[in-house]
Every structure is written in structure tokens, then in C-alpha cells.
Amino acid sequence: MSETMKAAIFVEPGKMTVEEVPKAALQQDDDIVIRMVRTCVCGSDLWFFRGLSGQAAHSQVGHEAIGVVEETGAAVESVKPGDFVVVPFPYSCGKGPVCKAGFESVCPHGGYFSACQAEYLRVPEADGTVVKVPGSPEDYSDEQLASLLTGSDVMST
């Protein structure tokens, strides 16, 4: 298995590249790694591309995705390898009072993705973050997959 993957890289305003980068890997027991099925360009991605907001030069981008679970950390209970999932742009623990009140996007244990436009993605706090989708990607048309992707909190452009 390759130790690298292809990923979209923001170079500077107006310039993106696709580069080989280290493959996403588990770092914590509550992580999963997914193989990307679809990702998209969000309206906020266009802000830094146009130079209207900050984004570190030579950094991975993207924060909406659907994919298939490739690997799970030892503490993950909600999904298993082979499961099809939607990955929202904020990740969260799903267990604390903030998350239970419905405010996952401000979870004190959470954060935001900026690496979904790649072949693989590490998802921290997986049990509180991903949403399992019935079946597998092959069960859906391209139009249905595009619709599922909007479930990841896409901001219209």
C-alpha cells in the first residue's frame, strides 16, 4: 500500500496544484481514515483562491466529503471499514453538553477540516462526526452522490 496520496494544494491566490503528500493515517483511537468518493469546492474555498481570506500557502484544502471507511481507531464504535459516510466540515465529540445541545460546530474538542480534496482523509472524533449512509456508493447514481455531498454542509456559491 502506498505511503502517499494525491491532494489538492493551495499555492497562492489564483494557483492550485495536485501533489503527492503523505497518506492520511490514524493518529488517535477515535480517528477513522476514509477513501474519498466525492468532494467539492465550497464557496469559502473560492475566498482564499481569490485572495479574499487567509489560507496558508502550500496547504491542503477542502472541507466537505463523502467516502468509504478504510480504517478505524480502537475506540470507534459507530462505523467500520467498508461503511459509506458523509463527513461534515466541522468535527466534534458528539458527547459533551455543547454537542448534545446541537452546537457541534463549536465543540470544545472539535475543529474544522481543510484536507478533503485528497484521495484519503483522517477524520478525528469519528463517532461524533460522520453520518453513516445506507448501502455503498455503487448503489447511488452520480446525481444522488452529488446530493449526498450537500449533506456535508456545503455553502452555496
Sequence positions of predicted segments:
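Short structural boundary motif marking the start of a folded domain
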Residues: 2-8
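NAD(P)H dinucleotide-binding glycine-rich loop of Rossmann-like/cofactor-binding domains
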Residues: 93-157
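Residue-level recognition of beta-strand termini and adjacent short loop/turns
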Residues: 12-14, 28
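Glycine-rich beta-strand-centered segment in the early N-terminal region that forms part
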Residues: 22-39, 49-100, 136
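Short Gly/Pro-enriched turn/cap motifs at secondary-structure boundaries
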Residues: 11, 23-24, 56-62, 109-114, ...
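Short glycine/threonine/proline-enriched tight-turn/helix- or strand-capping micro-motif at secondary-structure
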Residues: 15-22
